[in-house]
């Protein structure tokens, strides 16, 4: 054992396995590190048999199982119907798929398991392999083994595919389907050459079979520091699962910067959110938008993991053995850039007396300032007036008929709701998309410039996707010929594809080095004097993996680290060269100094149910926290992903309550097929904008100072902003609550400033406050 000490912390390092026990002398809490290996025989996933969306069958379903009588067709478990790819998180090891059945002799099972990585691999795929499963009869039903030898070290998740059949008229009953951990032979890393030097512990850390780096552990006051070093050009093609996140061994909540923020119970291993939320890389939609993770142990304090080098890192989230207790455990993994080490890594564990997420946000705000991410709206406006255009604006992504666009603008002017970013180019002509020149030639854009200049027009810009054939959109041959030589090549010389449109047409991925050429091409084709789109949303810029920038074409080679720099450069280039106000889809803190808004992260993206179209909420409200807003509300705004813009969906009051609670902006999608002008939808939209403005106009430059849950179930929440505005919202659809002598009915909002009520919900759909 090696020991390190500071004025606050005692660290005992185990030189046999690389794990530490850290005692916080201020809180008297003992924090232990664990590798993400589940306990033997622990259930790491329990299939919800009452979830009809993952079964292709008409049999009766309930929490007690599946029951019925076979006809001619088999019934199937199809997890892809309601699980985000890459599926259920898993750490490589040996597992067993178990099926409990009351009639084990009656079933025939054909099955396989698909293994996925959350990081686009070097050949351009997420699917690693498909392995057939051999089910055998047991005393409780059936089982099949999953072997670690079949899992690559970069396996992050799995999807099960199963087909059950039997003779016609055979009665059957499936009580339970679950995945159980068997054994994992060894730790994910090995330690050697341990030594002490200048109040530090140094050692050689080896991941997998060959990947070795030098590690130094030191301690300063309330922080334990890990530094990992190797030659930048050293080959590095495996995962390095180190250093582990500390855990108390008891109940705690993980504070996760996934979209707006999540608070997940570590020990609630059956909670749907725990096994359906993919963490993944930093600064990509399935991953995390801040280089941070938190552990809230309530009165026992808290711990923050701060990743100072996040660009070649991901976080997994699996069931682990936390001192004998099955617990979900986030685990940090470093990997190479184009197969080399590329940069040295640094991780800090900062221990807090108060583990509450609000306190963590205040601490992280200081860290963000140190890193240069805490760039407020006011500071950006002083630097560049183009930042002023979009502060406090809502987004309208219009899919209306283009002839109705002046009427839409008239409605916005009449209602006094001109604080919007409006997209013209999703407009339709009898249902078909228009191209940019049609709007110009018809004179709509000229009319707009003369009559509606207070409304800022914006346009999508997609520097990544290239279609070489017609599909959902007509082929742009001039652009295709211009861009095709900049397609990303994999290490095997294959051109990589990304997005697939609704017609099944796959787009090629373009190299990040093409970004400036793309924008120059677009602005030459659509000059601002004729096409007054003064704001640009860079589509998918911060939703996609930095790995998609790994290009092996010798004419324009690119790496992950270069891709991150190019993302910043293209936003800066658009603003400085063309005086454009720029925004992105997806959220990443390192882009804050370059833009004002990020689309989507008010949703919990890449989670089943991100919109009403999937007939469910995206996440339990008691799991959601406004961590992004607590850190960055006065720096960068977020809003719902575009699916939430549908003006007809039934959960609009919930969406608007959450927007007001978080002090954010609205997202609206008026669509031609609903005839929004003649059905009252536009009038309702402008009424909603006026209501949202009650908060937004008051807090758009504010920091968020506090957030709290006012009821045990988390339904009623309150936020407080630096101007003194407080917002209380009931996010529950069917239940009223008594709060401070007031009855707050479902989906209601109360806004106060300096103790005076300035708004309360009083409408049939949104409930009331009495």
Report the location of each language-model feature.
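Short beta-strand-plus-loop segments that form exposed binding edges in beta-rich domains
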Residues: 160-169
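Secreted extracellular polysaccharide-interacting domains
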Residues: 70-90, 118-122
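Asparagine-centered strand-capping/turn motif at beta-strand->loop junctions
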Residues: 101, 166, 230-232, 729-732
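Active-site-proximal substrate-binding groove within the catalytic cores of carbohydrate-active enzymes
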Residues: 5-7, 11-43, 293-302, 309-360, ...
């Amino acid at each position: 054992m090696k020991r390190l000490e500071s004025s606050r912390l005692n660290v005992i390092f185990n030189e046999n396995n690389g794990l530490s026990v850290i005692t916080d002398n201020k809180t008297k809490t003992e924090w232990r590190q664990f590798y993400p290996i589940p306990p033997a025989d622990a259930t790491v996933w329990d299939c919800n048999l009452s979830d009809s969306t993952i079964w292709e069958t008409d049999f009766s379903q309930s929490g007690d199982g599946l029951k019925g009588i076979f006809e001619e067709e088999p019934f199937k478990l199809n997890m892809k119907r309601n699980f985000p790819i890459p599926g259920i998180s898993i750490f490589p090891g040996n597992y067993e798929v178990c099926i409990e059945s009351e009639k084990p002799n009656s079933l025939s099972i054909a099955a396989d398991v698909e293994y996925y990585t959350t990081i686009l691999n070097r050949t351009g795929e997420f699917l690693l392999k498909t392995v057939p499963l051999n089910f055998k009869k047991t005393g409780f039903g059936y089982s099949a083994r999953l072997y670690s030898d079949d899992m690559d070290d970069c396996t992050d998740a799995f999807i099960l595919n199963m087909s059950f059949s039997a003779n016609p008229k055979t009665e059957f009953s499936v009580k339970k389907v679950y995945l159980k951990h068997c054994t994992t032979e060894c730790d994910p890393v090995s330690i050697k050459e341990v030594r002490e030097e200048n109040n530090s512990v140094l050692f050689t850390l080896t991941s997998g079979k060959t990947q070795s780096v030098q590690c130094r552990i030191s301690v300063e006051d309330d922080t334990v520091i890990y530094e990992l070093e190797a030659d930048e050009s050293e080959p590095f093609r495996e995962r390095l699962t180190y250093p582990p996140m500390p855990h108390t061994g008891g109940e705690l909540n993980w504070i996760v910067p996934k979209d707006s923020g999540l608070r997940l119970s570590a020990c609630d291993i059956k909670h749907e959110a725990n096994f359906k939320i993919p963490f993944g890389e930093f600064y990509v939609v399935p991953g995390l938008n801040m280089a941070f993770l938190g552990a809230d142990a309530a009165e026992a304090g808290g711990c923050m993991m701060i990743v100072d080098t996040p660009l070649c890192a991901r976080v997994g989230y699996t069931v682990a053995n936390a001192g004998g207790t099955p617990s979900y455990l986030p685990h940090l993994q470093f990997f190479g850039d184009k197969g080399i080490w590329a940069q040295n890594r640094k991780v800090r564990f900062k221990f807090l007396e108060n583990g509450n997420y609000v306190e963590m946000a205040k601490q992280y705000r200081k860290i963000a300032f140190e890193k240069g991410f805490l760039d407020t709206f006011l500071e950006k406006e002083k630097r560049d007036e183009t930042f002023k255009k979009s502060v406090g604006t809502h987004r309208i992504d219009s899919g209306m008929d283009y002839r109705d666009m002046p009427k839409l603008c008239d409605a916005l002017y009449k209602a006094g709701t001109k604080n919007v970013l409006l997209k013209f180019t999703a407009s339709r002509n009898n249902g078909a998309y228009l191209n940019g020149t049609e709007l110009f030639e018809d004179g709509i854009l000229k009319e707009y410039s003369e009559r509606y200049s207070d409304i800022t027009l914006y346009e999508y810009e997609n520097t990544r996707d290239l279609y070489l054939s017609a599909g959902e959109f007509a082929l742009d041959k001039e652009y295709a010929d211009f861009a095709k030589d900049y397609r990303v090549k994999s290490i095997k010389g294959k051109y990589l594809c990304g997005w697939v449109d609704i017609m099944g047409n796959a787009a090629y991925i373009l190299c990040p080095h093409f970004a400036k050429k793309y924008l120059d091409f677009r602005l030459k084709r659509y000059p601002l004097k004729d096409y007054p789109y003064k704001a640009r949303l860079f589509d998918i810029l911060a939703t996609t993996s930095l790995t998609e920038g790994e290009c092996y074409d010798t004419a324009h080679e690119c790496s992950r680290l270069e891709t991150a720099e190019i993302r910043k450069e293209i936003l800066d280039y658009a603003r400085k060269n063309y005086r454009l106000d720029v925004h992105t889809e997806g959220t990443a803190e390192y882009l804050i100094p370059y833009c004002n808004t990020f689309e989507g992260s008010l949703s919990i993206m890449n989670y089943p149910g991100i919109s009403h179209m999937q007939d469910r909420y995206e996440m339990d409200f008691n799991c959601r926290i406004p961590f992004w807003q607590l850190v960055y509300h006065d720096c960068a705004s977020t809003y719902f992903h575009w699916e939430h813009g549908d003006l007809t969906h039934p959960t609009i009051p919930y969406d608007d309550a959450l927007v007001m609670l978080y002090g954010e902006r609205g997202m609206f999608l008026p669509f031609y097929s609903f005839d929004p002008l003649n059905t009252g939808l536009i009038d309702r939209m402008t009424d909603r904008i006026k209501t949202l403005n009650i908060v937004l106009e008051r807090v758009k430059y504010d920091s968020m100072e506090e957030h709290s849950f006012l009821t045990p179930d988390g339904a009623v929440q309150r936020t407080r902003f630096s101007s003194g505005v407080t917002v209380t919202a009931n996010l529950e659809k069917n239940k009223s609550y008594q709060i401070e002598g007031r009855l707050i009915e479902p989906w209601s909002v109360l806004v106060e400033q300096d103790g005076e009520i300035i708004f309360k919900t009083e409408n049939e759909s949104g409930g009331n406050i009495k």
